[in-house]
Design a protein with these regions (language model features):
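Class I S-adenosyl-L-methionine-dependent methyltransferase catalytic core
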Residues: 1-314
Length: 314
């Protein structure tokens, strides 16, 4: 006789499970799957941050050939999902590569305490101007020289939804925050020497060459990046998460599987790879010139970006 392995679940349990699912979906505002697609946020303020980001060119000058066409133009949309999912209102969210200022603007708008640091003075000044336009009189700090906004000797504090937004200028291999003080980290690391960021000699990937030395190797670049993520590990609370937005790239005709190459360096620190999300960029049109170059070089156009989720040990 054939056995019936079906188990009956009481209707009240099914109802409770569905109610909890709806509660979480209302909180997150998206289905938590491993493949994400571009969509607007349906929030006037957040959409304005997205439009502001695209209009003003908040990202470094990218070479289409380096990333085979994949540009991180929808970063604020990704940030909104990640911040809602991995943090709660009142949590401390930080970014050690502050050229991604939309991440912090989104975090602040969602009721998180947002802080960031960046080495590049030009990015820093651009970000300060952007934040001042959005949130007047924020605390603008310099972790090395201890002056405010390059002019005022006063510590300025202003509040948006009761939260402080602090921006620091300095090398992220030495973060200014205490051990186990942060709740979530969101960042997009530099792309070796494929993209020009600034002339600071401490700049990962290009700094030594700018200072007159030899250009670092790819492995030396990853070791330097490891020092930044070691600091992120230090300041993040046990059991909390970090999201790293990155993509693979080409340099000197060599394909670098950046998203995979980074993982062993992270695990050496103590990070646990918790998840990988694929962000689909297929709605971004390819430029005609670039399409013809893809055909000539037999490269596939990248229409995705990786989001690696790491977790600090409990």
């Amino acid at each position: 006789m054939k056995k019936d392995y079906k188990t009956s679940v009481p209707q009240e349990k099914l109802d409770a499970s569905e109610a909890e699912r709806q509660r979480l979906l209302a909180k997150w505002r998206f289905e938590p799957t491993s493949m994400w697609y571009l969509q607007r946020l349906h929030d006037k303020t957040l959409d304005a941050i997205v439009e502001d980001t695209l209009a003003e060119g908040s990202y470094p000058e990218h070479n289409f050939n380096v990333r085979d066409g994949a540009l991180p133009q929808s970063s604020p949309i990704v940030a909104e999902r990640l911040i809602r999912f991995f943090s709660e209102p009142g949590d401390w969210v930080f970014n050690p590569f502050m050229e991604r200022i939309p991440h912090l603007l989104v975090a602040n708008y969602l009721g998180r305490n947002a802080v960031g640091q960046d080495l590049c003075k030009s990015f820093y000044e651009h970000d300060v101007a952007k934040v001042k336009r959005r949130i007047a009189n924020n605390a603008i700090l310099d972790s090395e020289h201890n002056y405010i906004d390059h002019e005022e000797p006063t510590y300025l504090r202003s509040y948006l939804n009761g939260l402080v937004f602090d921006l620091y200028l300095g090398d992220s291999r030495c973060l200014p925050w205490s051990n186990n003080s942060m709740d979530f980290c969101i960042n997009s690391p530099p792309y070796f020497s494929t993209i020009y960021y600034s002339d600071e000699p401490e700049q990962l990937g290009t700094g030594e060459a700018i200072g007159g030395g030899d250009k670092p190797t790819y492995e030396e670049f990853l070791k330097g990046l490891q020092d930044v993520y070691r600091e992120c590990y230090r300041v993040l609370k046990p059991g909390k998460f970090m999201a790293v937005l990155l993509n693979d790239f080409r340099m000197d005709k060599i394909f670098r599987a950046y998203h995979a190459d980074l993982i062993p360096y992270m695990e050496e620190i103590g990070w646990h790879l918790h998840d990988i999300i694929i962000y689909n960029l297929s709605l971004h049109p390819l430029q005609a010139v670039f399409t013809s170059q893809l055909a000539r070089d037999f490269h596939m156009a990248k229409q995705h970006e990786y989001i690696e989720i790491y977790r600090k040990s409990e």
